[in-house]
Regions:
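Short, flexible loop segments at boundaries between secondary-structure elements
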Residues: 132-140
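A short acidic, glycine-rich active-site loop
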Residues: 50-61
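Structural beta-alpha unit
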Residues: 68-102, 139-140
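Small/aliphatic-rich secondary-structure junction motif
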Residues: 2-47, 53, 78
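Short secondary-structure boundary segments
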Residues: 36-38, 105-107, 136-137
Length: 140
C-alpha cells in the first residue's frame, strides 16, 4: 500500500486537490495523508503564542473538513499540521512517508490575479523529488 500526500488549506483549489487525491487513493488502494503547512510566526512581539494558537485552530478546522470529505469517499486519512511553509511541509512529509506523489491545488488563499500557478505548487514542481499533481479548482 502506497501513500499519497495532499496539501489542503480549505480553499476551492484545496478541495479539488483533496477530491483528486482521494479518488486516486481509492483506485490504487493507497492511504491519504493530508498536510496543513503553516509558517511559524516570527519574533516580532508578545502575540506569538496567540497567533500560533489561532493558526493551529484553523488547521484543526481544515483537517475536520478534510476528514468529512474523505468519509464521503469511504477513504480513511491521516492528517499532519506542520509548522513550516506549505511546500517545505509537503516535501518533508512526502519524504518521511515515502509517498507515491504529492497532490495540491493550483492556488491557495488568496489567489493573485494573473498568476499561472500559486507559489506552493511552483516550488513543489521545482524542488520535489516526487511526482506532483497540480489540480485547478472545479469552478475555474
Amino acid at each position: 500500500m502506497g501513500q499519497i500526500v495532499v496539501g489542503y488549506d480549505g480553499s476551492a483549489c484545496g478541495d479539488a486537490a483533496l477530491e483528486s487525491g482521494l479518488e486516486i487513493a481509492k483506485d490504487l488502494g493507497d492511504k491519504v495523508v493530508v498536510v496543513f503547512g503553516y509558517a511559524p510566526p516570527g519574533l516580532w512581539g508578545g502575540e506569538i503564542a496567540e497567533h500560533e494558537e489561532a493558526i493551529e485552530e484553523l488547521g484543526e478546522k481544515v483537517m475536520a473538513s478534510a476528514r468529512s470529505h474523505a468519509a464521503e469517499h469511504g477513504v480513511e486519512i491521516e492528517s499532519e499540521l506542520v509548522p513550516k511553509r506549505a511546500a517545505e511541509a509537503l516535501i518533508e512529509v512526502a519524504s518521511k512517508r515515502d509517498a507515491r506523489m504529492i497532490v495540491v491545488g493550483s492556488y491557495g488563499e488568496p489567489q493573485l490575479k494573473g498568476m499561472i500557478l500559486g507559489s506552493t505548487p511552483n516550488k513543489l514542481l521545482h524542488l520535489s523529488e516526487r511526482p506532483v499533481l497540480v489540480v485547478p479548482a472545479a469552478n475555474r
